[in-house]
Amino acid sequence: MISDRKLEHLILCASCDVEYRKKTGFEDIEIVHRAIPEINKEKIDISLDFLGRELSSPVMISAITGGHPASMKINRELARAAEKLGIALGLGSQRAGVEHPELEGTYTIAREEAPSAMLIGNIGSSHIEYAERAVEMIDADALAVHLNPLQESIQPGGDVDSSGALESISAIVESVDVPVMVKETGAGICSEDAIELESCGVSAIDVAGAGGTSWAAVETYRADDRYLGELFWDWGIPTAASTVEVVESVSIPVIASGGIRSGIDAAKAISLGAEMVGIALPVLEAAGHGYREVIKVIEGFNEALRTAMYLAGAETLDDLKKSPVIITGHTGEWLNQRGFETKKYARRS
């Protein structure tokens, strides 16, 4: 049953090593330090408008859970934190709630606790018929369509037929009255796919790159035969490289997620052109201790982001996107071989 699988996923993410063994690529990114920032750190503004909503910070809580009674507490605490902080919150796949109405409460609790926060619904690309209900269920401000071919390939009994996915995404865009964004689930999005997605009419793309939670790893723990999961544990496009590939290829907003573990990572992602960053695993453990702990985590990210901006001489997020950045190592090699010019980032002003 879907509900039982959701619980397994939640337990595994909270208690096992499910992160990529390779890096996000942000270790190859350096923001050029300014010894004379010429700004007042106290006046740095990290607020933004995203898909028509005013947010206090570009740090959002990415989709984590839903669909099992045990997930209700997690979503409640995350929603309380999002409401108090004025940030966006993404929910886990709502398929379980649509197919089993008795589980709707594990999702609707988010809107009950966060009446004014930006909530992002979540369905799979093949479930066109679930789109409207998913939005209605939580009065969503936007709908995320998740892509997870890697996870499905490793998951016992997974759906490995992606035929017609782009057509389905286009239909979902047409079927709902809120912005639709597309997100990967930990393996990243390349330039070619980003261009196709923009042509489908989506309003934003969340790269959800490699370097954070590996869903191949999660499914490895669930499988009787772990060979395939072990083999593909680190499969995917590192988050930093995926962020540049997508930012350089489309004109819609990009969210960088996948292994964002600090405000410095957030600053680096935004300096590469991301509008927002998403975090999940860092707040999962905190949510078990209550929304105040979640708030502490987010505020820690925000303070580190402001500090990085100060040291870059960036008073706003737009200023940070213009700050010079050095791209080296594996990320630089990846991008150069893929035809993206990295030197232009180094001489921005």
UniProtKB/Swiss-Prot annotation:
Q: Where in the cell is it found?
A: Cytoplasm
- Main localization of the protein described in the UniProt heading: cytoplasm
**GO molecular function terms noted in the UniProt entry:** FMN binding; isopentenyl-diphosphate delta-isomerase activity; magnesium ion binding; NADPH binding; oxidoreductase activity
Share an example GO biological-process annotation for this protein.
Answer: isoprenoid biosynthetic process
Give the UniProt entry's GO cellular component terms.
cytoplasm
The enzyme's first-digit EC class, named in words, is isomerase
Q: Which gene encodes it?
A: fni
Q: Where does Mg(2+) bind?
A: E152
Q: Give its E.C. classification number.
A: 5.3.3.2
**What is the designated name of this protein?**
Isopentenyl-diphosphate delta-isomerase
Q: Where is the signal peptide?
A: none
Assigned keywords, A-Z = Cytoplasm, Flavoprotein, FMN, Isomerase, Isoprene biosynthesis, Magnesium, Metal-binding, NADP
Positions that bind substrate: R5, K6, S93, Q94, R95, Q151
Binding positions (FMN): S62, A63, I64, T65, S93, N122, K183, T213, G259, I260, R261, A280, L281
Query: Which family does the record assign?
Result: Belongs to the IPP isomerase type 2 family.
Q: Return the HAMAP family for the record.
A: Idi_2 (MF_00354)
Binding partners and assembly: Homooctamer. Dimer of tetramers.
Main role? Involved in the biosynthesis of isoprenoids. Catalyzes the 1,3-allylic rearrangement of the homoallylic substrate isopentenyl (IPP) to its allylic isomer, dimethylallyl diphosphate (DMAPP).
Q: Which cofactor does it need?
A: FMN; NADPH; Mg(2+)
Superkingdom of source: Archaea
- What InterPro entries does UniProt report for this protein, alphabetically? Aldolase_TIM, FMN-dep_DH, IPdP_isomerase
What this protein catalyses is: isopentenyl diphosphate = dimethylallyl diphosphate
